[in-house]
């Protein structure tokens, strides 16, 4: 009888240890693979009582792949596409006069992100990234049906920059998280080459929310042993 009781206790203990081991493995445990999709859309319209109307739309798309090198520390690579278009109407009648602008930038780089868990659901995050960007921009002057490219305001640009961002992570499920950066401190150096000139223009920006659009909403999936089991 004692042997049966001892054997039963050993079995229960084994299952309890295994269950505890599974429970202690979280989304940010060492060895997990992280797939992140960042997406942002911003729209603006300024419409005073008179003719002038200004509208703009910006779309930001940034996927990344990372690896948890140790618990709560993620290292990875990212890739991003930013697109922006705007229309600045000066006169609507009798003949419309406006300026149309669009720009596309592609960026890629490396990043590291540290998690500071508050509980099983929430965590503070701090991330640092460094990367390169390249893109083009174009502006057209429109008068009625006549479109004239503005070569003085069109061209190509390349840059390098880095940032430290601060945010929050919400993990409703062990293998999925919603994350948002709420503040960032960055620096960016950019060289613009305008179509009507062989000279480049160097621009350096530094301050809050400069590099990589610190405000963002990320959808994050974690892949690792036992994360997707019920």
Predicted regions and their residues:
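Flexible, solvent-exposed loop segments that connect beta-strands
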Residues: 41-55, 80-106, 132-158, 189-208
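Residues on the lipid-exposed face of transmembrane beta-strands in outer-membrane beta-barrel proteins
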Residues: 37-41, 63-67, 81, 108-114, ...
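Predominantly the C-terminal beta-signal and adjacent terminal strand-loop region
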Residues: 84, 88, 169-230
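Hydrophobic core residues within well-ordered beta-strands of beta-rich domains
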Residues: 33, 59, 73, 106-108, ...
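Bacterial Sec-dependent N-terminal signal peptides
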Residues: 1-24, 219
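Helix-adjacent hinge/juxtasegments
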Residues: 99-107, 112-121
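Short coil turns and loop connectors of transmembrane beta-barrels in diderm outer membranes
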Residues: 3, 29-31, 71, 118-122, ...
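Short glycine/proline- and aromatic-enriched beta-strand/turn motifs that initiate or cap beta-hairpins
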Residues: 20-78, 88, 214-230
